[in-house]
């Protein structure tokens, strides 16, 4: 797909193909972090899985969301471009959504620690949520850095981004305790 076609599909004006921060990749990564946190919150509240089951549930959830997201992108592109898509279009959509899986692995890493005898499964899932919240805060801060915001505004963006993670965990907690 050409750069012009990508602009039409995404509805944004991209200054170039090569940027220091790839906003699409970062947004997919954030999407995966939040999705992983939703799965983790459900695991903490509802189940008593082994550490390995918890890890697999988080990662397989990321894989399922990746597939759904890539498929939605493919359908959207077909409609926007009004043409049949090629195998390379399918491969690109899958590749562009890959950060969802990467982030699923990142938030699932603490779920492996009980296997080493370092903590309980419940504690590891809490640690996974904290990892997600910290990553969201870092993303918010770095977004402010990339747009040359003041230090105070960068901190505000970090707090706001972390707040999204806390809200996800809180909503899941409330839903599972009502």
What kind of region is each of these model predictions?
Residues 1-23:
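Short, Lys/Arg-rich, polar N-terminal cytosolic tail immediately upstream
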Residues 22-47, 162-163:
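The first (N-terminal) embedded transmembrane alpha-helix
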Residues 56-67, 122-134:
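Structural signature of hydrophobic alpha-helical transmembrane segments
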Residues 66-81:
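Membrane-water interface of transmembrane alpha-helices
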Residues 83-99:
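Juxtamembrane helix-capping/reentrant segments at transmembrane boundaries
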Residues 96-125, 129-133:
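Alpha-helical transmembrane segments of helical membrane proteins, especially in multi-pass transport
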Residues 141-163:
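Interfacial loop-to-transmembrane junctions
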Residues 167-178:
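Juxtamembrane boundary at the C-terminal end of a transmembrane helix
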């Amino acid at each position: 797909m050409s750069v012009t076609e990508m602009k039409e599909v995404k509805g944004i004006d991209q200054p170039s193909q090569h940027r220091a921060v790839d906003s699409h990749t970062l947004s997919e990564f954030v999407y995966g972090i939040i999705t992983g946190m939703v799965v983790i919150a459900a695991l903490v509240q509802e189940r008593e899985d082994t550490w390995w089951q918890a890890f697999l549930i988080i990662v397989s959830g990321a894989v399922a969301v990746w597939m759904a997201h890539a498929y939605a992108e493919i359908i959207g592109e077909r409609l926007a471009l009004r043409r049949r898509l090629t195998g390379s279009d399918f491969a690109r959509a899958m590749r562009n959504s890959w950060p969802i899986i990467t982030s699923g692995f990142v938030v699932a890493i603490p779920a492996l620690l009980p296997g080493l005898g370092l903590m309980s499964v419940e504690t590891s899932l809490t640690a996974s949520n904290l990892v997600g919240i910290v990553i969201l805060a870092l993303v918010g801060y770095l977004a402010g850095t990339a747009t040359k915001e003041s230090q105070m505004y960068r901190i505000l963006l970090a707090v706001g981004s972390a707040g999204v993670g806390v809200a996800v965990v809180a909503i899941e907690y409330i839903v599972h305790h009502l």
